[in-house]
């Protein structure tokens, strides 16, 4: 969809509290632009926790934009506040199967599911789906030393294909 552009840049930090629990937080700078209108910017944050039930199962919870910030000073449009609860099942350390419930305060409850297959120590392929709005994703991850690069294409009927890029560094 050529008339809309949405950007997010974040910096986050995660901490392992014990062998079975980790927490994380991220600060995000958001910008969206609709053709013919002003660009809107916002700063928000997100927090999450991950519980390792056993070697194969993990359960996580995440809150995005708990402060309910708005895009800019001159708009009533709020950045979505989203709650997520999910689980991951790992088989043979190469295949992850995930499921997640997502509740945006302004939209319907959504279900996500995905698979992540580690081909080797460098390359991972991923695919997933979201129930609302109905969409699918396909991507690859490249791991090099402490860096991870993710290239993803998401498809949704109204907006078409949305390319996404992620870069992570692990200290």
Give short role names for the model-derived ranges.
Residues 1-171:
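Subset of outer-membrane beta-barrel
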